[in-house]
């Protein structure tokens, strides 16, 4: 049975993620849960999230979910979305806090260029809307999705890593930043597949078929 735990720590539109997963595989059993044992017993785990990293890490600890999320990221197909990507890294500039430390790197703030200089592209924060994702790593979750396909973003921070071998996708705003990472059983993305129409649904479908 393809059982998927969507981790509920109180941040993000979990219903839209779970409905998208059910749409791409009607036979899948999708459970939105804050129960560590349900997360441990699931075949696959999805960690969405939208908001501030300090609140995210505090919520994981308050609900006793830190260890079950770490275990899932080490042992089973794991999809991180937005904050679910950022929490995997070592630390965040947002609140200068430690994150889970599963992947090497740091969460950094996007730089605004909202100036009067006409030669500088006006870049406002948060980065919100559709943008191209350039695939930098061949991976099963990109199957059937063309490189430079547009996905939907809502974020003010991004992940920076010194290990290029884990970078699976990049986006420009206006400088390039990492928007997807992959290592072993982990695939994590800055954009929102549940808001990204057919491309997002294709990625979620690929995740449900993935056997790392």
From Swiss-Prot:
Localization per record: Cytoplasm
Provide the GO biological process annotations: L-histidine biosynthetic process
Query: Could you tell me the keywords of this UniProt record?
Result: Amino-acid biosynthesis, Cytoplasm, Glutamine amidotransferase, Histidine biosynthesis, Hydrolase, Lyase
List, alphabetically, the PROSITE patterns matched.
GATASE_TYPE_1
Q: Which SUPFAM superfamilies match?
A: Class I glutamine amidotransferase-like
Q: Record's Gene Ontology CC terms?
A: cytoplasm
Please name the InterPro entries in this protein's record.
Class_I_gatase-like, GATASE, Imidazole-glycPsynth_HisH
Q: How does it assemble?
A: Heterodimer of HisH and HisF.
Name the UniProt record assigns to this protein: Imidazole glycerol phosphate synthase subunit HisH
This chain's source organism reads Nitrosomonas europaea (strain ATCC 19718 / CIP 103999 / KCTC 2705 / NBRC 14298)
Q: What is the organism lineage in this UniProt record?
A: Bacteria, Pseudomonadati, Pseudomonadota, Betaproteobacteria, Nitrosomonadales
Gene name as annotated:
hisH
């Amino acid at each position: 049975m393809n059982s998927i735990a969507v981790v509920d720590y109180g941040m993000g539109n979990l219903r839209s993620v779970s409905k998208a997963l059910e749409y791409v595989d009607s036979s899948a059993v999708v459970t939105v849960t804050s129960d560590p044992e349900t997360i441990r017993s699931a075949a696959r785990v999805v960690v969405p999230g939208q908001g501030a990293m300090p609140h995210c890490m505090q919520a994981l600890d308050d609900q006793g979910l830190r260890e079950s999320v770490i275990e899932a990221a080490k042992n089973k197909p794991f999809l991180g979305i937005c904050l679910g990507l950022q929490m995997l890294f070592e630390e965040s500039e947002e609140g200068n806090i430690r994150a889970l430390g599963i992947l090497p790197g740091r969460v950094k703030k996007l730089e605004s260029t909202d100036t009067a200089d006409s030669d500088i592209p006006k870049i406002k924060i948060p980065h919100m809307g559709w943008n191209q994702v350039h695939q930098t790593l061949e991976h099963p979750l990109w199957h059937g999705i063309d490189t430079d396909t547009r996905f939907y973003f809502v974020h003010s921070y991004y992940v920076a890593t010194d290990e290029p071998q884990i970078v699976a996708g990049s986006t420009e705003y206006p400088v390039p930043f990492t928007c997807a990472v992959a290592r072993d059983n982990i695939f994590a993305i800055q954009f929102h597949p549940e808001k990204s129409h057919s491309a997002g649904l294709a990625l979620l479908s690929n995740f449900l078929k993935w056997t790392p």
